[in-house]
């Protein structure tokens, strides 16, 4: 086990993080999965659970150090933990936006800052940040979530330029809708403005429908494992809708992309 690749995956209680942790374990890696509460987390075969709140500086430092103490190193960090938020931009309170960015963006800053000294000392490592197709596409009525994922994209690309001198690479995985509870149970902006009611409902129903018909997390988990262990590429979009959307964004004119996106959110 001492020669196995040591992988840390944040947010393994359910969904994509749990599926990714399982796949790393099956690949023979030594896997540490972080959860907010071990007492409330279901056991995960082949995965060592670590209690860590990615929104708390001290918790992240303690959690990462405990893994290093046990495994003596961290080869791969997968930043998967995240949350969603729906509602019009005008409806979203700054406190709600701050909480979202704390979880989706600043958590990556915390974990990266905790692992990078050790990776720099070893002159190797890989950081995989789970973004979204909404990191390169707009999303009506998911504006703040989309903004947080755009931030993840910029942070990751900049980080990669900074750390490659140390033999470390950062990379992105950009899934589309996946059949998890993240979007089905997404919190809504607490302040509702009646003028947005009709379109907000249409967009919300479209998202729920897309999630219910979306693939299970296994495909995204495969992309994460390849991003971590395979040849470095800046971004990976899982096969299917995510890959198609990436190609549309790159190769289609802006007008048709805009019209297609509005249609997919039920806005005509």
Model-derived regions: residue spans:
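Conserved glycine-rich cofactor-binding loop
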Residues: 13-14
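Rossmann-fold cofactor-recognition segment
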Residues: 45-58
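Substrate-binding pocket helix/loop in short-chain dehydrogenase/reductase
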Residues: 88-89, 96-98
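C-terminal beta-strand-loop-alpha-helix "lid" module of Rossmann-like NAD(P)-dependent dehydrogenases
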Residues: 162-211
């Amino acid at each position: 086990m001492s020669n196995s690749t040591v992988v840390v995956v944040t947010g393994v209680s359910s969904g994509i993080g749990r599926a990714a942790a399982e796949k790393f374990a099956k690949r023979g890696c030594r896997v540490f999965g972080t959860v907010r509460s071990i007492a409330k987390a279901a056991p995960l075969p082949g995965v060592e659970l670590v209690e860590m709140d990615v929104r708390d500086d001290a918790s992240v430092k303690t959690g990462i150090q405990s893994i290093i103490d046990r495994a003596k190193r961290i080869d791969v960090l997968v930043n998967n933990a995240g949350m969603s938020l729906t509602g019009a931009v005008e409806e979203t309170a700054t406190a709600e936006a701050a909480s979202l960015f704390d979880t989706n963006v600043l958590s990556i800053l915390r974990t990266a800052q905790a692992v990078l000294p050790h990776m720099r000392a070893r002159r190797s490592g890989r950081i995989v940040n789970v973004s979204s197709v909404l990191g390169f596409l707009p999303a009506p009525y998911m504006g703040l979530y989309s903004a947080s994922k755009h931030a993840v994209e910029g942070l990751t690309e900049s980080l990669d330029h900074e750390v490659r001198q140390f033999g470390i690479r950062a990379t992105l995985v950009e899934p589309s809708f996946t059949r998890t509870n993240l979007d089905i149970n997404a919190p809504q902006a607490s302040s509702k403005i009646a003028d947005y009611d009709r379109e907000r409902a249409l967009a919300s129903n479209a998202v729920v429908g897309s999630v219910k018909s979306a693939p299970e997390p296994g495909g995204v988990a495969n992309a994460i494992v390849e991003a971590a262990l395979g040849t470095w590429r800046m971004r990976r979009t899982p096969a299917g809708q995510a890959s198609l959307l990436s190609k549309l964004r790159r190769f289609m004119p802006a007008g048709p992309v805009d019209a297609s996106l509005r249609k997919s959110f039920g806005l005509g």
